Amino acid sequence: MAVANPTTEQAILSEVRKQNRDRRALRFWLGFVLLALFCLVLVGGATRLTNSGLSITEWRPIHGVIPPLSAAEWEEEFRLYQRIPEFQQLNNSMTVDEFKGIFWWEWAHRLIARGIGVIFALPLLYFWLTGRIEKRLRWPLVGILALGGLQGFIGWWMVSSGLSVRTDVSQYRLATHLVMACLIFAGCMWIMRGLSPHSNDPAPARSSRGFAATIAIFALFQIYLGALVAGLDAGFSYNTWPLMDGALIPSDLLIQQPFWINAFENPKTVQFIHRIGAYTLFALTLINMVIALRAAPWTTHARRAVVLFSLVTLQAAIGIATLLMQVPLHWGLLHQAGALVVFGFAIANWRGFYGEYPHATAIAERG
């Protein structure tokens, strides 16, 4: 029988302890990034709900950090806004002081986005150079950084859609912008969850991992639909529940031609699909919870299933309240915040079925 080498065991234990310290630091960093992303999405939602997204008509990644500081600079910024259709057709009586109200939302949104780039890139460089990032995670983290850079271009691409002909931004580009933000959020959540300790509880069923993936992906699809609702102001189409102006299925869902375009450009149809999506997500998480509680009660997987169903139920209630109150700003933002919480937890739940990233040992490193 082989006798363990105390020196080798000590080296392995030392390596694991060091890796655990590094993982705690990475989790703290990614958690802070997730919090910043959450704030960014909320400010972006407020920018949309207050119709502030077109208040800054130029893309100046570096110079744009500094807002107007004098009356003359404010007049110049306002003059640029006066050139676009939104001002000419909708806001032609707006004053400079009123313009400042919408300007600050868009400026804050862009400033936070730039700040997130810094708080992601600089720690990433530091952790990389000091050898604290495991090899398996280096390029995925670089990929998230690249998505962040791409998101900046997508944001301007979205804004530019409302500067020449339209009086608002394209709902397609708005949805793309929000989905990309969610993908960046999901990437950070996935890695942070993989760096966290996991229980050894068995999965409730063979299909649990696939079902968790389905829920997470469908939650993202529901967010995409929500972005279309916001982009088309579809939240004002039907402000009754559970019926839609007295009908389960309204008669004016397919009034545009070709018929399929209604799913993207008819506000009433988009709201209807978003409602159906909410019912579907509710059903998926209910089934998931029932399976988990029956097959593996008292496990961490069952507890996650209960929490996920509870979050979706709460989000549905917030959505209904927002609808009935005709989308007041604070309720609209609460609904958007709830969507990101549901999606983030769905990603963490999905990642939970894969277990913690394996620890590298001193022997493996030498090999």
UniProtKB/Swiss-Prot annotation:
Heme binds at H274, H335. The chain crosses the membrane at residues 25-45, 111-131, 139-159, 174-194, 210-230, 276-296, 305-325, 327-347. Pathway: Porphyrin-containing compound metabolism; heme A biosynthesis; heme A from heme O: step 1/1. GO terms for molecular function: metal ion binding; oxidoreductase activity, acting on NAD(P)H, heme protein as acceptor. Its EC number is 1.17.99.9. It catalyses: Fe(II)-heme o + 2 A + H2O = Fe(II)-heme a + 2 AH2. Pfam families: COX15-CtaA (PF02628). InterPro entries: COX15/CtaA_fam, HemeA_Synthase_type2. Its cofactor is heme b. GO terms for biological process: heme A biosynthetic process. It comes from the Bacteria. It is a multi-pass membrane protein. It is found in: Cell membrane. Signal peptide: none annotated. Belongs to the COX15/CtaA family. Type 2 subfamily. Catalyzes the conversion of heme O to heme A by two successive hydroxylations of the methyl group at C8. The first hydroxylation forms heme I, the second hydroxylation results in an unstable dihydroxymethyl group, which spontaneously dehydrates, resulting in the formyl group of heme A. This is Heme A synthase. It comes from Rhizobium leguminosarum bv. trifolii (strain WSM2304). The gene is ctaA.
